[in-house]
Amino acid sequence: HLHACAGTSYIWTVTERVNFHSSPAIHLIGKKAFAMANMDVGDVSLIDLYSCFPSAVELGCQELGIAEDDPRGLTITGGLPYFGGPGNNYVMHSIVTMAEKLRANPGKFGLCTGNGWYVTKHSAGIYSTKPVESDWQREDPKKYQVEIDSMPHPTVTQKPSGPAKVETYSVITDRKGKRFGLIVGRTANNSRFLANTSDDDVTLDRMMREEMLGREGQVSQEGPINLFRFA
């Protein structure tokens, strides 16, 4: 029996999101699903968090209030990277596995979540062999999607210039070992921008070795790209 469900989409354009270390959309589907089922996360016995990448699992734990070392475990299939996602259909398999495990544990409750795109589309369902005791009706997601859509979006500048700091970053390597650095940063007026770093080994090695979040520097346009130089 499906006791609760919820679905939302986060801000579609990644550069317009509030930050890169939280997911208000996951938090909202958890809030809605647990309210619909009249329970909280401590009442479920089985959990399967969508597990395309470690960061998706970490965000799920953070937003749903589940410890990363929760003794209940975070997957019932072994996780998407190991179980697989045949036909781009992993969540159907996690729901079927959940049904099998709940039939073996009558009366227990289980939570399955899913996400798609760049941790953009989110869903949650709470299941049990126990029948729903009251009238049940799915809430139209449009009624609460507005909570996400109305969140403040950072201003994104295409031509940043001047003092800036790192909001998040990555060093990307191709199959031949060629590397380049990518910065998402904030200018002095808090506008967000995208920029490359210089491609010298000293800079890229430093980015791989040290924590660069919050580091300051200068950003400017150089030809067709924005370039960020660490102070």
Annotated model-derived regions:
Residues V202-S220:
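Short nucleic-acid-contacting surface segments enriched for D/E, G, S/T with interspersed K/R
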Residues M36-M39, F53, P86-P106:
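Active-site-proximal alpha-helical scaffold in enzymes
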Residues H1-G7, V41-Y50, D69-G78, N105-N115:
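Beta-strand segments within the central parallel beta-sheet cores of soluble alpha/beta enzyme folds
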Residues N190-M208:
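Beta-strand/loop nucleic-acid-binding surfaces
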Residues H3-W12, F20-A25, E63-S94:
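Conserved catalytic cysteine-centered active-site region
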Residues H1-P24, L28, K32, V96-T97, ...:
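Condensing-enzyme catalytic core mediating Claisen C-C bond formation in acyl metabolism
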Residues G30-D43:
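Phosphate/pyrophosphate-binding loops at sites that engage ATP/ADP/AMP, CoA/4′-phosphopantetheine
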Residues T15-V18, S51-E68, G85-Y90, V119-K130:
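Short glycine/threonine-rich loop-to-helix capping motif typified by GTGT followed
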